[in-house]
């Protein structure tokens, strides 16, 4: 089940496995999609939508639920739910599985941010999506 109106406090159990620490800011632009199965949050996607641009802040799926298409579906939901021109994200160059997923979804590497992470460079990736929306309206 997809939950698009998520209260951050409902994610506390999944954060036990998740290693990043966030100070969640009350923002009109921050959106959270979670994926719930058997009353348990097993994945979440944090993203900002500002006008025609979207930035994926983070994606996390519990290990036992990975490689089941959950992250791909959440990213595609952003495309379906918001009329944005593009989506950007940042990923560690060491996270080969994530890079492969993003490339499979049509993201392109556009920049490298040296020493962005404590143990690696960051790769900035971009997916152009606006033309797909226009195609829907034209045909």
Where is each model-derived feature located?
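Conserved acetyl-CoA-binding loop of GNAT-fold acetyltransferases
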Residues: 103-111
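Conserved acetyl-CoA-binding loop-helix of GNAT-fold acetyltransferases
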Residues: 61, 67-80, 100-104
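Acetyl-CoA-dependent GNAT
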Residues: 1-64, 72-75, 130-131, 138
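Short aromatic/hydrophobic contact patches that present stacked aromatics
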Residues: 58-60, 88-90, 124
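Conserved GNAT acetyl-CoA-binding A-motif
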Residues: 82-93
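Short, solvent-exposed loop/turn elements at beta->coil junctions and helix N-caps
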Residues: 24, 112-116
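C-terminal "cap" of GNAT-fold acetyltransferases
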Residues: 92-96, 115-139
């Amino acid at each position: 089940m997809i939950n698009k109106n998520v209260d951050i406090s409902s994610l506390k159990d999944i954060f036990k496995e998740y290693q990043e620490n966030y100070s969640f800011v009350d923002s009109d632009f921050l959106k959270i999609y979670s994926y719930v199965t058997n009353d348990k949050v097993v994945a979440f996607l944090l993203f900002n939508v500002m006008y025609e641009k979207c930035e994926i802040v983070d994606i996390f799926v519990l290990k036992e639920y990975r490689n089941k298409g959950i992250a791909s579906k959440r990213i595609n939901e952003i495309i379906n739910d918001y009329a944005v021109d593009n989506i950007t994200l940042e990923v560690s160059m060491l996270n080969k599985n994530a890079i492969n997923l993003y490339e499979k979804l049509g993201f392109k590497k556009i920049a490298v941010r040296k020493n962005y992470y404590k143990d690696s460079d960051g790769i900035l990736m971009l997916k152009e999506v606006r033309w797909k929306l226009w195609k829907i309206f034209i045909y």
